[in-house]
């Protein structure tokens, strides 16, 4: 069963993980170098042992594929995954005249009074991003995040490389190539990035008329992050298979530092007590010639009947 791949990762780290400190000072149980394999012909690997919001996954992936780096598109689709990174740029700017938002990520979790103030300020910010083109251009853009690296990698000569278009062309015209790789990891950007790319590099492989994808993820939050990553790259594989006239093969997920945060241990144990349900099916309401023309409404999952959401704090 598809989901057992993920549940076995949780079990393995609970039983064998190393206690480690981390950037967020939360503490983790961690292992290094873990691989999962998902046969996409068996269904779509959206977890059923807890609800995973597919709407957020597809709008974020399509945002990446459009080469967009401004959160306005996400906000238009009620997706707030990247809000904090843009909000941080705003509250640290000279133009911001509101209440002190220093260390808002930590304070919003530990100070209920501050959290209410933070929510008001962030809502004002996102509304202004949606309504004000000039403000959005200045404070909604996140710079060299995934969309930029995938679609407009900056070279030393000042040109850009569209890695997604290049890899689709290679799959169509040279499917035996071992160079069908997209990288988001740019050593030059790492020191200045708010969060260097976690899903760093992925590679495609064609055999027997099927397209497979392997992701190398340098760092993976097992409870909150990895379920998103699995579904996102499975969807990417499906989209590129459609664009190249291939069936889907496997999604192979290789993780460097795979970790469970210490404040997620109870949630992981609760999830492991649940019985997986049948995997949903991915359906396309409309198929486009170009992978870059899809909108969230074109893609749905059918037969998704998950167990309820399990809430957990985000490590900041």
UniProtKB/Swiss-Prot annotation:
One GO MF term attached to the UniProt entry: thymidylate synthase activity
Pathway in which this enzyme or protein is active: Pyrimidine metabolism; dTTP biosynthesis
Protein's UniProt keywords contain Transcription regulation: no
Reactions catalysed, as given in the entry: dUMP + (6R)-5,10-methylene-5,6,7,8-tetrahydrofolate = 7,8-dihydrofolate + dTMP
Keyword presence, Cytoplasm: yes
Record-linked InterPro entries: Thymidate_synth/dCMP_Mease, Thymidate_synth/dCMP_Mease_dom, Thymidate_synth/dCMP_Mease_sf, Thymidylate_synthase, Thymidylate_synthase_AS
GO biological process: dTMP biosynthetic process; dTTP biosynthetic process; methylation
Active site feature: 198 (nucleophile)
EC class (word): transferase
Compartments reported by the entry: Cytoplasm
Role: Catalyzes the reductive methylation of 2'-deoxyuridine-5'-monophosphate (dUMP) to 2'-deoxythymidine-5'-monophosphate (dTMP) while utilizing 5,10-methylenetetrahydrofolate (mTHF) as the methyl donor and reductant in the reaction, yielding dihydrofolate (DHF) as a by-product. This enzymatic reaction provides an intracellular de novo source of dTMP, an essential precursor for DNA biosynthesis.
Subunit details: Homodimer.
Assigned protein family: Belongs to the thymidylate synthase family. Bacterial-type ThyA subfamily.
Protein name as annotated: Thymidylate synthase
Gene: thyA
């Amino acid at each position: 069963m598809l989901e057992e791949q993920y549940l076995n990762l949780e079990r393995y780290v609970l039983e064998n993980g190393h206690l480690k400190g981390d950037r967020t000072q939360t503490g983790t149980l961690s292992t290094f170098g873990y691989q999962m394999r998902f046969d996409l012909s068996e269904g779509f690997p959206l977890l059923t042992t807890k609800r995973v919001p597919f709407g957020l996954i597809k709008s974020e992936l399509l945002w990446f594929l459009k080469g967009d780096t401004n959160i306005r598109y996400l906000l238009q689709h009620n997706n707030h995954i990247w809000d904090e990174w843009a909000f941080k740029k705003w509250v640290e700017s000279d133009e911001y005249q509101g209440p002190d938002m220093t260390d808002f990520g930590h304070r919003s979790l530990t100070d209920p009074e501050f959290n209410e103030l933070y929510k008001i300020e962030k809502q004002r910010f996102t509304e202004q991003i949606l309504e004000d083109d000039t403000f959005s251009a200045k404070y909604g853009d996140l710079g060299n995040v995934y969309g930029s690296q995938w679609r407009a990698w900056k070279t030393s000569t000042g040109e850009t490389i569209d890695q997604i278009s290049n890899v689709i062309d290679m799959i169509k015209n040279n499917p035996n190539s071992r160079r069908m790789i997209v990288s988001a990891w740019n050593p030059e950007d790492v020191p200045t990035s708010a969060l260097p790319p976690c899903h760093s590099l992925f590679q495609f492989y064609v055999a027997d008329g099927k397209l497979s994808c392997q992701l190398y993820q340098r760092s993976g939050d097992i409870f909150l992050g990895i379920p998103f990553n699995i579904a996102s790259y499975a969807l990417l594989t499906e989209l590129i298979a459609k664009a190249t006239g291939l069936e889907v093969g496997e999604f192979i997920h290789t993780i460097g530092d795979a970790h469970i945060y210490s404040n997620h241990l109870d949630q992981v144990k609760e999830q492991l007590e649940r019985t997986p349900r049948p995997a949903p099916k991915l359906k396309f309401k409309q198929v486009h010639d170009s992978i870059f023309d899809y909108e969230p409404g074109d893609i749905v999952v059918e037969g998704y009947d998950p167990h309820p959401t399990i809430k957990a704090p985000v490590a900041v």
